Amino acid sequence: MKSREHSCERTISMIGNKWILMIVNEFNTKKEPLRFNFLLEKLSPISSKTLSVKLKELVKYNILEKKISSMDPIIITYELTEKGKDLAGLFNSMTKWGKKWQKQ
């Protein structure tokens, strides 16, 4: 039982933030690499500083991968890792649950 509680607590500490959830959900919805400014616009009113911090956290947790192109100008994109895709699958369940119970 302790191991299960510890796993749940660790997961919540990683993703239990409004902006982390909103960012991962945006990747789950689009299913393609996304750029910083696109996320900043879609997640308004998030500040650029908050978005930057949360993206760094998601990269640190290996949920997102940051890719830097070798083109000029340099293009930076983020995309879900396998771990991130697995996490994004939870959003489908959360969406179904939300639709079912939103009227109560």
Describe each model-derived feature in a short phrase:
Residues 6-50:
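N-terminal helix-turn-helix DNA-binding core of bacterial DNA-binding proteins
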Residues 5, 89-104:
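Amphipathic alpha-helical dimerization/coiled-coil segments
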Residues 51, 55-58:
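Basic amphipathic alpha-helical segments that dock to polyanions
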Residues 9-14, 65, 99-104:
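HhH-family (HhH-GPD) DNA N-glycosylase catalytic core used in base-excision repair
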Residues 70-91:
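Basic, amphipathic "hinge/linker" alpha-helix immediately C-terminal to the N-terminal HTH DNA-binding motif
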Residues 59-69:
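A short, conserved structural fragment
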